[in-house]
Regions:
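Patatin-like phospholipase
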Residues: 1-48, 56-298
C-alpha cells in the first residue's frame, strides 16, 4: 500500500550511513523505528549487509517490519543454521529471507519504496565485487522488485558460508568485506555531514589477526583473497576514522552504549529484543537532542 507522509526533511547535504554486523543489526532497526515514529527521513542512505536490509524497511516506511523479520520470525522459522548451508549453500535461508518474506510472510511495500526513489531519494546498497576486490554502491531505481531482493541478498552474503550472488553478470558478496562503514562514500556523493549508525560499542576494535588466504580459497578470485587477508586491519582503520570524524564534529554517531552481547549469528531472542529496545531508546534520544540541527521544513 502506497503511503504518502508529511514529514520533516533532513537537510539534503546530510546522509545516513548504516553499518552491518549480522544480528547486531537489530540495534539499527530499533533506531530506524524511532526515526519513523517521529517521521524523520533522510534523502540519502548508504547501507551495508544487515544495515542495508534494515534500511530497506525504513525506505518503505514500514515501522517494526525489520524487527518482525529479524526477531519474531527467527523464533518461528529458525532461518540461521548449518542445515541451510547444506541445502541452499548459505548459512542463512535465502529462499525464505529474500523471496517468501518480502512477497508473502512479511510483505515489503515496494510501491512506497519506489515512490520515494522516484521523488529523488537515494538508497545505495554496498556489495563487494569478487573479481575486482572493490566495493560497489548499487541501486534499483526502475521498479524491479526481484533485483532489489537480490541486492539485499548479495550485500548480506557472508564469505565462506554463503554462495556468491550474480548481479548483472558480476560475482558479489557481503559489502562489509570491502567497505564496512561507508562514510567516505557518503562524503564523495556530496554529503558533508552524516549520521552514522554503528553496531559496535565505542572504542571496540577487533583483536584478531589477519591471515593470508590459501590459494584454494576463492581460487578464481585472487583480488578477493587479498581483500580477505587484510579485512580486520581495514575494519579497525574505519573504526578509527569514525572516532576521528566524530571528534571533529563532522559526523554524528549512534551506537550501543551497553556492552554488546549479541553475536553475528545470534539466536537468543531475549538478547536480540534487548538490543533492539536499546536502539529505540537511543534513536528517540538522538531525535530529541539533534533533530533541530538536521531538519528543514518540507
Amino acid at each position: 500500500m502506497l503511503k504518502l507522509l508529511v514529514f520533516m526533511q533532513i537537510n539534503s547535504n546530510i546522509g545516513l550511513v548504516l553499518e552491518g554486523g549480522g544480528m547486531r543489526g537489530v540495534f539499527t532497526s530499533g533506531v530506524l523505528d524511532a526515526f519513523m515514529k517521529h517521521d524523520v527521513f533522510f534523502r540519502y542512505i548508504v547501507g551495508v549487509s544487515a544495515g542495508a536490509c534494515n534500511g530497506l524497511s525504513y525506505m518503505s516506511r514500514q515501522p517494526r517490519r525489520a524487527k518482525i523479520s529479524n526477531i519474531d520470525m527467527l523464533a518461528k522459522y529458525d532461518y540461521i543454521g548449518l542445515r541451510h548451508l547444506v541445502t541452499q549453500g548459505c548459512i542463512l535461508d535465502p529462499e525464505l529471507l529474500y523471496n517468501k518474506f518480502p512477497y508473502e510472510i512479511v510483505p515489503f511495500d515496494y510501491d512506497t519504496y519506489f515512490a520515494n526513489i522516484r521523488r529523488g531519494d537515494v538508497f545505495e546498497i554496498v556489495t563487494t565485487n569478487c573479481l575486482t576486490g572493490r566495493s560497489e554502491y548499487l541501486q534499483e531505481r526502475d521498479g524491479n522488485s526481484h533485483r532489489l531482493n537480490e541486492l539485499a541478498r548479495a550485500t548480506s552474503s557472508l564469505p565462506y558460508v554463503c554462495k556468491i550472488v550474480d548481479i548483472g553478470g558480476q560475482p558479489m558478496l557481503d559489502g562489509g568485506i570491502a567497505d564496512s562503514i561507508p562514510i567516505e562514500r557518503a562524503i564523495a556523493t556530496g554529503h558533508s555531514k552524516n549520521v552514522v549508525i554503528c553496531t559496535r560499542n565505542k572504542g571496540w576494535r577487533d583483536k584478531g589477526k589477519d591471515h593470508k588466504q590459501p590459494r584454494f580459497v576463492y581460487r578464481n578470485y585472487p583480488r578477493l583473497r587479498v581483500l580477505l587477508s587484510r579485512r580486520l586491519k581495514f575494519y579497525n582503520e574505519q573504526l578509527d576514522m569514525v572516532d576521528r570524524l566524530e571528534a571533529e564534529n563532522s559526523i554524528l554517531v549512534i551506537r550501543p552504549e551497553k556492552e554488546i552481547v549479541v553475536g553475528r549469528m545470534e539466536k537468543d531472542i531475549r538478547k536480540l529484543e534487548n538490543l533492539y529496545e536499546e536502539g529505540v531508546v537511543l534513536g528517540n534520544r538522538f531525535i530529541k537532542e539533534h533533530l533541530s540541527k538536521l531538519t528543514a521544513p518540507y
